[in-house]
Amino acid sequence: MTRDEDNGFSEWGGYFEAKKSKLEEQFAAASDPFRKSDLFQGISIFVNGRTDPSADELKRIMMVHGGTFHHYERSHTTYIIASVLPDVKVRNMNLSKFISAKWVVDCLEKKKIVDYKPYLLYTNQKTSQPMLIFGKPKDNGANESKSDVEPPKDKAEVEVDSTKDETQMELGGILKNLQQAVATSPEKEASASESKITNLSTTSNNSTTARTAADPNFLSEFYKNSRLHHIATLGAGFKQYVCRLRQKHGTQGFPKRETLKSLANSHHNCLERYVMHIDMDCFFVSVGLRTRPELRGLPIAVTHSKGGNAATDVPVHPQADRKAELELFAQRFEHHFHDGDKAEKVRSGFDKKMSLSEIASCSYEAREKGIRNGMFVGQALKLCPELKTIPYDFEGYKEVAFTLYDTVAQYTLNIEAVSCDEMFVELTDLAHELNVDVMAFVSHLRQEVYSKTGCPCSAGVAGNKLLARMATKEAKPNGQFLLDSSNDILAYMAPMSLDLLPGVGSSISHKLKQAGLNNCGDVQNTTLEKMEKVLGKKLGQNLFQNCRGIDDRPLAYEQIRKTVSAEMNFGIRFTNSVECEQFLCQLSEEVTKRLVEIRRKARSINLKIMVRAAEAPVETSKYMGHGVCDIINKSSLIKYATDDVNVITTVVLDLMKDADIPPDELRGLGIHLTRLEDANEVRKENNIKEMFGKMSEMRKDKPIPQGAVGDKSIGDDKVNKPLVFENKPKPREPRNVLSMLTAAAVSRKSVTEDRSQRGTSKPITRPLSLVPKLDEDVLAQLPEDIRLEVIANREEHLCIAEYDGYRSPQYPTLRSPPLLNPYVTTNVSPLKATDLKPSTSRAAVARLQKRKERKEQEHYIRSDQIVADYIDDLPDFVNPHILKLISHPVEMPELLMGDNYKDLLNDWVSREEVPKPNDVDLILKQVSRMIKNDQLDHVCDVMKYWCRIINMKRSSSCCWHVAYKHIEESIQNQMLTIEGYSLLFIEYIRCIKCS
């Protein structure tokens, strides 16, 4: 889609340029009340990276002294303030003036604009034409004040600061390189697009901005200029920061703990374990008010919107239909996600021309007016017309977050990072080993954080993570609370809403409400059996315990990334498949870069596709937003983990091709990599290849003994080969077990008659020279599991050789009977290579015995596999055995137990518009067998995948919905009969008609 004259944004010169202009207008409006001089009148600056003074301080200086502060580099930016630039920027430098922040300080000191040339960091000068220096840099060495000299720090502070210096720049890179396009959950479909891109701008001097994802520069431009994704990645960044602090600290002590001696406990601590949950109060608002103290006490909201009249008269595309879009979103929230609050939010704030920007954070004064985080700005202004809005301050968030973590790390590193402003801390060692009064320490810590950051925080302390988080809710705002044995935990938890507990979302909450369970008190009064029936065994047990204040989860100090993803649901407007493929190639490169940077490889590749819903308007209420969409997930599991961009790109393109979606219907694309493995792990086959190479080199170095060659010439290239497999037997044709038994019986009869005639018994054996010989040196170098497999393979050949020796030549080999059922195999062993590994585990022995029994059972051929004319050709003495086999019942093939069950279900659903009753009965029998075999996890996997592909059918598929619900109901009835509880299926049929 190209931008035309009637799209509502042409008069601004584009959406991104409008955002830039909005930020400049905000800055100008905020500067007027505080302006003291016009020293920097007509001068604009843009801060690139870390500087001294900081970006916030430079912004305040420009605000007070008449200058302009650009949030993004623009063509008319006067100076770019920086301390250091990467090499790529230096080599690609244009005519921009990169100067030191010292220039601003010196201008203030002299109260005039000084020459910028001495403060230039880099220039485009050449050795043949050096730059002319018109002035000398000012020597400021004598003007340093004593207050600028920091006092000496103790050892612990130096260690934390050194790690921070090493990590902060890396974390800045992590926050940029681990960019996750803010993943829009289904609950946020109605509003997340605009909030993602409001901070987006361009650095192009011309109006050649990348307007849609079809533009080759769109993806790089989005990630280069949009900083809102930092919110989603700050948590991951600080989890890595805590890991690095722990690794660097090792077994060293904490000198800062010496200051806690004054906090000695006068009485015995009442809990065996102390867990603290610390959370900053209204984090975004608190950081923003540090530079806006005049706004304290007023209702404040952090958002991209200006507020005021600008938030109630937003331009809307002429072809957009807000009313239709509103109703579609509301229906989905109510019927699919069972979230009435979200539906009400859409209905009350998704009308007219009101701003759909979301409020990221609001002050407690605003909350008293009914405003909540995530609310639309237009809706909030209806509740509170005097609401003040402030912009994001990402550098400030990072600065305060580092200070918070560094302060806690001076006392303990038993930290579980949750986000940039929230963490769990284990205080048991401080309480018992140092005999410290826990609440006195918490008060001391909170005061230290406030003195360093100017931002308040609250803390809750209890015996586990769940109660500690609950205690924090009691402590807010700016307080602390201890939930110990003196409190009646059951009475405290009883009125708590169930959606406050971990793992309880809108879907689980809806099921609980249907069962008459609205709060923790209701669960306390019910039985464990009922909870397991409603939610399944595992989740039912967890919720049953949590409602009683029981939580055994330990703190996760070193958290390993389990997924890496990159997603884009703004500006996805393709006109052909070529544009779509080009964008997917770029997105694959982006997600691969993130994967490499965390030193991981992925085995599972998932492609998330957002397709415009059939009933949704083509143009969305939000410019270039995704609107109401159907979400399709396609996944592929590759053989080996990879971080190769070519492999990932190929898989992604294949998945997109399989989806077969028209390009103009796409509204969002995302790549998610899972099943991550350590990139430093080397695959076993590589080690084996290397071992064979070393053995070959060793053989070359060994002298050949005289006479070892025999009659062969010295030049024969087969002499020095380390392994000789020339006599390796050819692969045998698959033989039916019945034919082998028949031939063996005939051979035994012949041998018996021959022995009786001769009176002697001499075993008839096959020459074992045809069995491959093993090199003992090579065998000794093999890993244990491979060596056992090779030995077992050789023993198998020996057994075959002995068996062939008993074959009677007077009876030809009988032909194998035809197999009527292609799913039944007779000569495939269920044992894997790893099963040959010796194990002392009783469970392992039991598994091997069970597999052995299954293997023996599979050798039987059922009656439906035997053809009548084949039976007639058999000798008479074999017929009784065949008749005995015929009397055995026929076993159903296990269609859903293989690795290809997804392909089977996918083909079935895609090929049939209406499921046949016989097929449904077959699937039901398969699932029932799995339940009887206690394969409940596989039942859940099968039902989850089947439900997903049914939901993906865009045509009328209510017949499939009925079939699925029929099988689901049968499964639950069988589970209640056998196990006494029901299974929890996280996927469900999303159909308003069926509902």
Swiss-Prot record:
Protein name as it appears in the record: DNA repair protein Rev1
Annotated Gene Ontology cellular component terms: nucleus; replication fork
EC code: 2.7.7.-
Positions that bind Mg(2+): D279, D421
Subcellular location(s) of the protein: Nucleus
Site (Substrate discrimination): F284
Assembly mode: Interacts (via C-terminus) with PolH/DNApol-eta (via C-terminal regions). Interacts (via C-terminus) with PolI.
EC category name: transferase
Domain of life: Eukaryota
Biological processes annotated in GO: DNA synthesis involved in double-strand break repair via homologous recombination; double-strand break repair; error-free translesion synthesis; error-prone translesion synthesis; regulation of double-strand break repair via homologous recombination; translesion synthesis
Cofactor: Mg(2+)
Source organism of this protein record: Drosophila melanogaster (Fruit fly)
Chain sites annotated for binding dCTP: S361, C362, S363, Y364, E365, A366, R367, N373, D421
Region span, Interaction with PolH/DNApol-eta: 878-995
